[in-house]
A protein has these predicted regions:
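Carbohydrate transferase catalytic cores enriched for Leloir-type hexosyltransferases
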Residues: 1-403
Length: 403
C-alpha cells in the first residue's frame, strides 16, 4: 500500500502550515508504514526545509495554470468537455503516476476533488464559515460557496475525516449528516516545541532574538500570535487597551504578530488613531525562532478569537508554561476550560479585570504547572500515531479485497 501525505503551503503561511508540518513528521514516523509513506509538497521553500532534514519528498508545484484548470473543472460544461477529450487535472495525473493507493490531506484541499478513484483522508480544522459567516474572510470572492462545495465533496467521498475536537465532529454530523464512524478526533499537536527542542542547547539564541525587539522590560508582556483576520478580534484588545490608558495603567504591553489577511491596516490605523503605541506593538511577521523567543520571554498569551473551538496557541502556551487568556465558552464541555483564563469578548473591561491575575504569583505558578502536565496528556505523539495507524490498518485491510 502506497500512501501520499499532501502538505500544502510553505512556512510563510503561519499556524495552519506548521500544524500540518508536525502531522506530516509524525505520520512519517509510523514504523509499520514508513517505507510506503511519501511526502507530497507544493512549494520550493518547503522542499528546502525537508532537504535540510534529509527527508525525501515529491514536489507537486502549484502554479497559475493548475489553478486555472481547477476553476475549469468546477464548471459543468467545461468539465464535460475536458473529460471528452481526456484531459485530467494535473494532480490526478501526478498521483496516478506515483501509484498512490491513499492520499492524506493534512487540511481541507481543493486537490481532494481530483483524486477520483484514489481514496483519501482529509483533515478539517473548523467549520467557522458556517458558524461565523458574518466575517468578511468567509464571504469575499465566493469563499463561502467554494468551502461549502469542497466540504460537501470531502464529507461524501473521504475514507475518513480527521478533526481536532469532539465539537468539530458534532458540527460535521449536524451540518453535513456524516456517519459518525467516519470522523476521527485527533487533537492539535504544535510544531514549535519540536523546533525549540532541536535548538534547546542554545538558549541564549532565544534571549538574543527577543532582546533585539527592544521591548520595555518593566512591563507585563502579553503575546498574541495570530494572522490579521477579522475573526481573530484584535479590536477587542485595542478596546481593552483604551480602558487601561484612561485608567493610566501602563503595566501591560500587548504584542501582535502575524501576516496580513485583510485586517492589518485597519488594526494598525486604529492603534495609531487612538494613540495606543505605548500599550500595543505590532510585528507583521516573525520567524519560528522569534515566535519561540516571545513565548519564552512574555508573561502570557491572549486569544480573543471568535473561531475555534481550539487553536494552536493554546497548546503552545501550555508547553511554554504561559497562561493564556481565551474566549469564554468557545470550547464546550471540555476539561481544557479549567486551564484557561476565560475572557468575555463582549466586554473589554472583563479582560482588564482578568489581568489582575498577575498580582497572584502563587496562582500563576500553579496554573502553568498544571497546564504543562495537561499538554503532555493531550498532545501525546504516540496517541497521534496510534490513531492514524488504526486508520491505515483499516484501509489496508479493505484494499486487500481487490489489490
Amino acid at each position: 500500500m502506497k500512501v501520499g501525505i499532501y502538505l500544502e503551503g510553505s512556512p510563510e503561511m503561519g499556524g495552519g502550515f506548521f500544524q500540518s508540518l508536525k502531522s506530516s513528521l509524525l505520520l512519517l514516523d509510523i514504523k509499520r508504514y514508513y517505507p510506503e509513506i511519501e511526502l507530497i509538497i507544493t512549494h520550493k521553500k518547503t522542499e528546502e526545509y525537508f532537504q535540510k532534514k534529509k527527508i525525501k519528498n515529491k514536489l507537486f508545484k502549484l502554479n497559475k495554470v493548475y489553478n486555472y484548470l481547477s476553476q475549469l473543472f468546477e464548471i459543468n460544461y467545461s468539465r464535460e468537455l475536458l473529460s471528452k477529450i481526456r484531459i485530467n487535472h494535473p494532480f490526478y495525473n501526478f498521483i496516478k503516476k506515483q501509484k498512490y493507493d491513499l492520499i492524506i490531506f493534512l487540511g481541507p484541499s481543493q486537490m481532494s476533488k481530483f483524486c477520483h478513484e484514489v481514496a483519501f483522508i482529509s483533515n478539517i480544522w473548523d467549520l467557522d464559515h458556517k458558524k461565523n459567516s458574518q466575517f468578511p474572510e468567509h464571504n469575499l470572492n465566493n469563499i463561502y460557496e467554494l468551502k461549502e462545495k469542497l466540504f460537501k465533496e470531502i464529507t461524501t467521498r473521504a475514507f475518513k475525516i480527521v478533526v481536532p475536537h469532539k465539537s468539530n465532529k458534532n458540527d460535521l454530523i449536524n451540518f453535513y449528516k456524516v456517519d459518525e464512524n467516519k470522523v476521527i478526533v485527533q487533537n492539535f499537536i504544535p510544531m514549535l516545541p519540536t523546533i525549540y527542542n532541536e535548538n534547546k542547547i542554545n538558549k541564549e539564541l532565544y534571549n538574543d532574538l527577543f532582546n533585539k525587539f527592544k521591548l520595555p522590560l518593566d512591563k507585563i508582556i502579553i503575546f498574541y500570535p495570530a494572522q490579521f483576520w477579522a475573526h481573530k478580534n484584535h479590536k477587542y484588545i485595542i478596546d481593552a487597551a483604551e480602558i487601561l490608558k484612561k485608567e493610566n495603567n501602563k503595566k501591560y504591553l500587548f504584542v501582535f504578530c502575524g501576516g496580513n489577511k485583510g485586517n492589518f491596516n485597519y488594526i494598525k490605523n486604529l492603534i495609531s488613531k487612538k494613540q495606543l503605541g505605548e500599550f500595543i506593538k505590532i510585528h507583521s511577521f516573525l520567524t519560528d525562532d522569534e515566535v519561540i523567543s516571545f513565548y519564552l520571554n512574555s508573561h502570557g498569551v491572549i486569544m480573543p478569537t471568535y473561531c475555534g473551538p481550539t487553536n494552536l496557541p493554546i497548546y503552545e502556551a501550555f508547553y511554554f508554561k504561559k497562561i493564556i487568556f481565551y474566549t469564554k465558552d468557545l470550547i464546550p464541555n471540555d476539561s481544557i476550560n479549567n486551564h484557561l483564563i476565560k475572557i468575555d469578548i463582549s466586554s473589554p473591561a472583563n479582560l482588564c479585570k482578568e489581568l489582575e491575575i498577575y498580582n497572584d504569583t502563587e496562582r500563576l505558578d500553579k496554573i502553568v504547572k498544571d497546564n504543562y502536565e495537561y499538554y503532555k496528556l493531550v498532545c501525546n505523539e504516540n496517541t497521534f500515531k496510534e490513531n492514524y495507524e488504526k486508520i491505515l490498518n483499516e484501509f489496508s485491510y479493505l484494499l486487500n479485497r481487490w489489490k
